[in-house]
Amino acid sequence: MSAIAPGMILFAYLCGSISSAILVCRIAGLPDPRQSGSGNPGATNVLRIGGKGAAVAVLIFDVLKGMLPVWGAYALGVTPFWLGLIAIAACLGHIWPVFFGFKGGKGVATAFGAIAPIGWDLTGVMAGTWLLTVLLSGYSSLGAIVSALIAPFYVWWFKPQFTFPVSMLSCLILLRHHDNIQRLWRRQETKIWTKLKKKREKDPQ
């Protein structure tokens, strides 16, 4: 089945290139997320500029565009190595989307969706790690960084044959968050609660 893997890689990249943040903001009449807030077309920035409803829509779509190509390849019996490349292709499409001038998000939700087909137990643990980190720290970016660091160890425990591809995916996410890591180190990163507070003050209901 690895013969179809190159085509699946291209398909995954094209799926990832559909920027839900930009499309949702256009449909909802919101500012372009690439030019507003943090400038990152992802769910967290859409939460800042558009509120919870728009952010949830972006989050769900971003998860699905990582999940569906990998799930399809997994069902067809593609080997773990190629599955890893397909997952990375979906994230690369999200980060550098061919349909939107190669300016995309950071790939966290798409990576989470790409890992989900490995197993719901792993998915639950990963989601719990992100949520717990965000609740304790208030930093969405720190939740993504911690989850990316721990993901290979979780996978090694649940399904060790996928450790290498998930490690590659984690490296991509960490590289994409290098600016956030620097801001966290300098204590200049904005907490997600602050973003929500500013949104309420700007648009009181």
UniProtKB/Swiss-Prot annotation:
A single GO BP: phospholipid biosynthetic process
GO cellular component, one term: plasma membrane
Domain of life, per lineage: Bacteria
GO molecular function terms noted in the UniProt entry: acyl-phosphate glycerol-3-phosphate acyltransferase activity
Transmembrane in keyword set: yes
Pfam families with a match to the protein in the record: G3P_acyltransf (PF02660)
Main localization, broad class: membrane
Residue spans crossing the bilayer: 4-24, 56-76, 81-101, 112-132, 138-158
Keyword Lipid biosynthesis carried by entry: yes
PANTHER family per record: GLYCEROL-3-PHOSPHATE ACYLTRANSFERASE-RELATED (PTHR30309:SF0), INNER MEMBRANE PROTEIN YGIH (PTHR30309)
Protein name: Glycerol-3-phosphate acyltransferase
The species this protein was found in: Citrobacter koseri (strain ATCC BAA-895 / CDC 4225-83 / SGSC4696)
Gene coding for it: plsY
